[in-house]
Amino acid sequence: MKKTIILLSTLALAACGQNEAPDSYMSNARESFQNVWEHYRVPEYGLFSEYYPNTFKPDLNYFDDGTHQAQESSFLWPMSGVFSSTVLMAKADPGTYRPYLDSMVVAMEEYYDTTRVPFAYQAYPSRFDRFDRVDRYYDDNGLVGIDYIDTYAVTKNPAHLEKAKQIFTYILSGWDDRFGGGVPWVEGKRDQKPACSNGKAMVLSLKLHEATGDEYYLEIGKRFYRWIRRTLLDPNTGIIMNAWLTDG
């Protein structure tokens, strides 16, 4: 009987833990989200800093053309991370976080470049004019496109769907038949075709198919999938390689 009571007590505690876990995860998410918006947001621009405190401006090494020092606001890659988290929070609790999502949509347009066709998101906001030329990365645009199609799933605003489609058009403009297809990392440079650019393009394409039912996006998604498996999959390990180096 004693063993039975202990067993039942253990099961009851386990059940309580299972019930509390989602609330615990959401509580942690709310706290982390609030910390980012309180400490990283740059109110005068409606953007976010690369680091906290914003006075810390080290060299950043995730660029194709070498290092760049952190600036007044973050580059596009970290900014997309904030966008992604905001979409998920708005999906979980629209009443609380939908205004944050609306704010993010406005902020992302600071990175939108209409001086080059197709239009796309560049690595740093155009308002600051800190660089002679700001690169546009296919993988970053893939992230932003995924953010927009996920935003559309929350808002049902057709403008967000159109934005995702437009970004996909830009990414697809980088596809060429060298080495059987694929897109590079950076616009205008053909030295590599990485998993990050092509994998995100595949995800965006399949999400567009899911949202629209258009078979075109399914076929393009399959094309990216086949290229990744044919070109980047290591048959000995089953692992996708980082990139196909084209040396051109």
Task: Go through each PLM region and give its residues.
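Bacterial Sec-dependent N-terminal signal peptides
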Residues: 1-22
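Low-complexity, Ser/Thr/Pro/Gly-enriched N-terminal "stalk/linker" regions
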Residues: 16-131, 158-181
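Extended ligand-binding clefts on enzyme/binding-domain cores
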Residues: 23, 27-52, 157, 166, ...
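Short amphipathic alpha-helical segments at helix-loop
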Residues: 67, 129, 152, 189-190, ...
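Aromatic- and histidine-enriched alpha-helix N-cap/loop-to-helix transition segments
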Residues: 70-84, 135-146, 192-203
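Well-ordered alpha-helical scaffold segments within catalytic/enzyme domains
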Residues: 80-96, 143-158, 200-214
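Surface-exposed, active-site-proximal loop segments in enzymatic domains
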Residues: 122-136, 153, 193
